[in-house]
Amino acid sequence: MTETDPRLDISDLLVRYATGIDSRDWPLFRTVFTDDCHLDYGEIGVWNGVDEVTNFMDQTHAMAGHTMHRLTNQAIAVAGDNASARTYVDAVIMFGDNQAGVNALGFYDDEIVRTADGWRIARRRFTHVRVTTFGQP
């Protein structure tokens, strides 16, 4: 059996984040992060630990309608059991009525570690480039 390119596994990890959050599959979402992860989303908030970030995302997305987190331009660098990734994000978060929403553009800077369970995000910084609203609530 051959080992896969770690960049493919990390790309799958990043897609798993989007899939977990958009489907509100919180057990899947939790598999993206280390237990002691640190996430800094600037004005949106800062969270320490997978429980804290999962609870926040669950509560805020419970009020939302449909969401789509599209991740592109994944620049991944691997050094042994550590990696870094910069990923562009184009997120559409519909309000509960699905008639209006927010479009957030920015990028994630991730520090990723290989664990016994596979690659996990240990630290994430979200930098927003533009946030716009659309539609009539």
Tell me what each language-model feature is.
Residues 1-35:
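Short, low-complexity N-terminal intrinsically disordered segments enriched in polar/charged residues
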Residues 5-12, 51, 81, 86, ...:
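Binding-site signature for planar aromatic cofactors or substrates
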Residues 12, 67-69, 104-105:
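Short solvent-exposed loop/turn micro-motifs enriched in small/polar/acidic residues
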Residues 26-91:
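A solvent-exposed, acidic/Ser-Thr-rich amphipathic alpha-helical stretch
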Residues 84, 105-135:
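Short beta-strand edge/turn micro-motifs at domain boundaries
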Residues 91-93, 128-129:
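Beta-strand elements of well-folded, non-transmembrane domains
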Residues 93-98, 133:
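A short, acidic/glycine-rich surface segment
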